[in-house]
Regions:
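Flavin-dependent oxidoreductase catalytic cores
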Residues: 1-170
Length: 170
């Protein structure tokens, strides 16, 4: 959805409805590239706040069209992606999907909805689910446990005030 960027102090534009099919087809092209490179399996990342996860999570998906609102609507883009992926994968390439069990914060995906997403992914053709949790932008410690290399992570940040803010607050 359009609004403030969770990853940097900028504003973002939500994908237009007419852009979604091309984005889904890009996933299918990626599967074809993996096949050409000799892989016999692919993992689709639908967790941690990446694109599919942003459609699934009620926290980030504020769309007013048929891709937002109810869980059924929020799963539409995922279904579109999986159709392209499964078509490209054929019957001889395994498809795994990494997905969140919980987003890790109030207003995000919870286990009751996740169970429905998991069932849908199996219906869509996924051979395995890789269960995870958290949003790297919203709850990084939920995703990355233990000590984080803050100085290394901030080394390449362009905004000095963001760099020092992250170093001071973690």
């Amino acid at each position: 959805s359009s609004g403030f960027n969770l990853y940097s102090p900028t504003f973002v534009r939500g994908l237009r409805k007419d852009e979604l099919p091309a984005m889904a087809k890009a996933y299918g092209r990626s599967v074809n590239l993996a096949r050409e490179a000799g892989f016999d399996a692919v993992e689709i990342h639908a967790g941690h706040g990446y694109l599919i996860s942003q459609f699934l999570s009620p926290y980030t998906n504020h769309r007013k069209d048929e891709y937002g609102g109810s869980l059924e609507n929020r799963m539409r883009f995922m279904d579109m992606v999986m159709e392209e992926v499964m078509q490209a994968a054929g019957s001889d390439m395994a498809v795994l999907v990494k997905m969140n069990m919980r987003d890790g914060f109030k207003g995000g995906m919870e286990i009751d909805e996740t169970m429905q997403v998991a069932k849908r992914l199996v219906q869509d053709g996924a051979q395995a689910l890789v269960l995870s949790g958290g949003f790297v932008s919203k709850a990084p410690m939920y995703v990355m446990r233990g000590e984080m290399p803050i100085k290394t992570m901030t080394h390449y940040m362009n905004c000095w005030w963001l760099k020092y803010g992250v170093r001071m607050a973690g």
